[in-house]
Each structure stands twice: as C-alpha cells, then as structure tokens.
C-alpha cells in the first residue's frame, strides 16, 4: 500500500501543471459525457398551489431577503447542441471503402489476366496504377537493371573521339592537265600489254558500290590537294615513262578472303588503287600500296589465327561440357538405380505385408464359412429329426386309422382317405401351376428383351422403343431389379431412340475430322486461332496410335480401333480423356454413346434377372 501511494505521488509530481490539450473529437466526446452527467436547474419554478392554511403573514424583511435570493444566483448557460457528424463519418467510410476496393482491384489485376483487362479499361487511372506496381515488381526481381540502365559500352563512348573532320574538307577546283599522247598513262592501249591485270583492275572496282567509289575518289582528291600549299612550290618530279600500273588485290590471294570484314577492306583497297592508278603520280604510291598489301595479308593471317584459337577454345569447352554431361549422366543413372532399388525393396515389403493381410483375411473367411456350414448342418440335422418324428407320428396315426377302418369297415374311413388324396392333388396342381406361370412369365420377359434388342439392331435410324420397354415392364411385374434397370435408362433414349453401332462409327469419323481441326486450339482461342488450327490441320500427318501418348491424334486412332472391335465402353473412355475444344466438340457424340451403353447395360441386367428367375424355379 505504501509503495503504491508513493508511486502515485511521484507520477503526479512528475506530470506538468498545465494539462495537455486533448484532440478535438475527444474533447467533444468528453464534453458531451460531462454534460450528460451534470445536473441543471430550471430558471422558473413551477407554481405551487396556495392553500388557506399556508397563507400566513410574513415580515417585510424576510420577504425582501427571500426575493433577493433568486436574483443573486447565476443563471446556468444552456447546453451546446451536439453535432452528430454523419456526413463526416460517411465521407471517411466512403474514402476507406473506395481505397480498399481500389487496392483490391489492383491486387486482382496483378493476379488475373481477365480482371486486368477490365480494370485497366474501365477504372480511372487503373492502367497507371497496375503499371507502377508491375514496374516495382520487375525492379525487385531484377535489381541490376537500374544499375546498367545508363551505362554505355566503351565502343559507343569512343565514337566521339574517333570521328574527325579535316580542315580542308569538301570539294575544290583543280585544272586538268592534258595527258596528250603519253603512252605510260593507262588507257585502252594498255589492254594489249597486260590483259590479265587490266581485267582484274576493271572487274574488281566494278564489284564495289557506287557510293564507295565516290567516297574513295573524294578522299583521293583531298589527299592530293593537301600538299598543294602557297608556302612553297613543290618541285615537279619527272615522270617515269612506261611505269606499270598498280595491280589490284584479289580475294583469293588474301588469307580468310571469305570473311565480310576482309572483303570490305579489299574492296576499299582496290578502290584506292583504282584512284591512284588514275593519277599521274601513281608510281610513287607503289611502295605504300605494297606495304598495305602486306598489312592486309597479315590481317588475314591474324584473323585465321584468331579463328583457329577460338575454334580450339570452343572445342575444349565442348569437350569439357561433354565430360560434365557424361559425369552428370552417370550420377543420374546411379541415383536412378538407388531409387529403383529402394522402391523395389519398399514394394517388396508392401507386397509381403499385403500378402500376409490377405492370407489372414482369407483364413478368417474360411473359419467363418466353416462355422456357418457347421451350423447349417446341425440345423439341417435337427430339421431331419423333426421330419422323422412327424413322419413317425403320421405313420402311427395312419396305422391307427387303418386299424379303425379295418375294425369299422365303413364308408366313412374310405371317404376321409379320398378327401385327403384330393387335397394333396390340389396342392400339387397349385404348385405346378405357379411353376408354369413363373416359367411362362420368364420366357415372355426374355422374348420382350429380345424384341427390344432386335428393334434397336434392325433400325437404320434412331427409333423410339417405348412400347417394347412398356411390355418389358408389364411382364416383369413388381420386380425391383427390372424396375431399377428401366429407371436407369435416360428418358430421351427410349423416347427418341438410340443410334446403331454403324451410325456411331460414321458419326465418330465426322466428329474426328472436326476434332483434328481444333486439336491445336488453346482453351481461350479466338477467331485467328481457329483459322490457324484449321489450316494447320490440313497439313498434319496421321501417325500410328501409341499406347502411352495422350495427344489428340493418338486418342482418335485408339478410339477408332476400339469402335471397329465393337468395344464402345473403352472407346467412350478414350474420348472422355480429351481436353479443351476437342472434348467440347465430342460432347454430343459421348452423350449418344453413353445412352447406348446405358440401354445395353439395362437390357443385360434384365436378361440376367430373367435367367436367375429360371434357375430359382428349377
């Protein structure tokens, strides 16, 4: 008690003297609760009736004091009207409900494709919200995309530094010098001197594109104009008469000439040679051209070596991968063998346990059967003893009657004997009549069942067999088995009829064609998918039926084989295993086969019941 009081005092001292202002809605709630618990007095009292006994003379001082009392008391302030705030609550609930519904819609749109289409199309800002959460999910799964988003490749960064524009770019005028009759210049007269090289020089530039030729010519002109500066006039070198033109480079002479990069380099080099050959000072470029040829040869050799190294590295990687795959295959085979051995041991244990259980159950069943057989034998023995006692009693009575009759030698004894004989004969005739009636009814039932079956087999088109079925029901009487068999038949089967086996096979072939057309359709296929499946079904090859495969073509082939064998039950099971559009298209055919199977099964049950009744009579 002392500790609790001390703690309460410390808490009061530690708290601030100024009370903390409460929230507005809490203050209103507290004020309303305080006003509800506070008592108020009315300003004017209700008048009390004055009786003659209460009207007594009062002094003036007392009256003055009494009148001054009510005026001195303060009048209480009226209670403020309490605001309900219904609109505010409704608005808050509406905002919360809308937010929850919108959030639930976004969540369902992320999970379901159908609801995603509806939500993004009809709900305002639905597409932006779903896209925002999908991007968040994508960045959560692949965080490296944000890092590599603004990263550029080194090649793209270096492109700006590699591209340079020369100072004297563009075209400039130049006087054309007349060559005159210089035999050293290339022309038609050079074809007789070097026919093979001239052909190569004319064929190879023609293989290049016109744009490449134009670029090469411009580049050659710029290079030719650069040394011409006004500082000093270069000395004109004497022309070398009879200098041979520079020959172009063949693809076959370059290593790895079939590579696209090498071909482009050779084309560019040949264009440069063509431009240099067209120049008057082509002889002084022979050494750089020869050096460029050697560099091209080296480039081809380097490409060949790099490709060989890459091929060797790829071969080593392939060999390593083969070794890894072989090791994985051996490990998988080992695990498979272990699992198979474990499964075999487990199956063996389960088999032994099941065999012991079956043996125990069989022993118990044998003991039960033996006990029942013993009880039946004892009961039969007791019945035989009772019958023998009755027979002895009857013989005793008969002997007594014989003695009485012999003694009396009257007609009364003979009359009683005749009456008993007649009664026995009537009993015998009645029993045989019941046997004959039962046999006749059984035969009539069998004939009626055969009539229904023959009517179904002879009909080329589905024909109702209500009359035959009514005849079977009337002949069966109150047999519950026959009534249950007839009740199991679909009313549409005997009212409209069922197709024959040939009609079922013929209709199956038509249905199979439609199923093959729709075999490639998904469950939510549209018009384009239907058209594509129809076109592809025309070019599909038929294959043999496989026992373990569940594709549409194998199921159709197995069903057709079963129908040709007359096994409708297994054929219906095969067709029922289809899925998607194939099952939807074969639904009517399956319904017809089910009705046929139901009718056949009911007829077999009725026929079996008729045979059982015959055996019971016998």
UniProtKB/Swiss-Prot annotation:
What ranges does the record list as Basic and acidic residues composition bias? 209-238
Main location class: mitochondrion
Q: Where is this region: Disordered?
A: 44-81, 148-244
List all topological domains (Mitochondrial matrix). 42-89
A Pfam family that this protein carries is Mitofilin
Matching entries from InterPro entries are given as: MIC60
Judging by the UniProt lineage, the source's domain of life is Eukaryota
- Which residues form the organelle targeting sequence per the record? 1-41
> Membrane topology per the record?
Single-pass membrane protein
- In this UniProt entry, which residues form the Mitochondrial intermembrane topological domain(s)? 111-618
The UniProt keyword set, sorted, is:
Coiled coil, Membrane, Mitochondrion, Mitochondrion inner membrane, Transit peptide, Transmembrane, Transmembrane helix
Coiled-coil spans in chain: 289-403
Record's keyword annotation contains Glycoprotein = no
Q: Where is the composition biased (Low complexity)?
A: 46-60, 67-81
Q: Where are the transmembrane segments?
A: 90-110
- What role does this protein play? Component of the MICOS complex, a large protein complex of the mitochondrial inner membrane that plays crucial roles in the maintenance of crista junctions, inner membrane architecture, and formation of contact sites to the outer membrane. Plays a role in keeping cristae membranes connected to the inner boundary membrane. Also promotes protein import via the mitochondrial intermembrane space assembly (MIA) pathway.
The entry describes its oligomerization and partners as: Component of the mitochondrial contact site and cristae organizing system (MICOS) complex.
Family, according to the entry, reads as follows: Belongs to the MICOS complex subunit Mic60 family.
> Can you say what this protein is called?
MICOS complex subunit mic60
**Protein species of origin:** Emericella nidulans (strain FGSC A4 / ATCC 38163 / CBS 112.46 / NRRL 194 / M139) (Aspergillus nidulans)
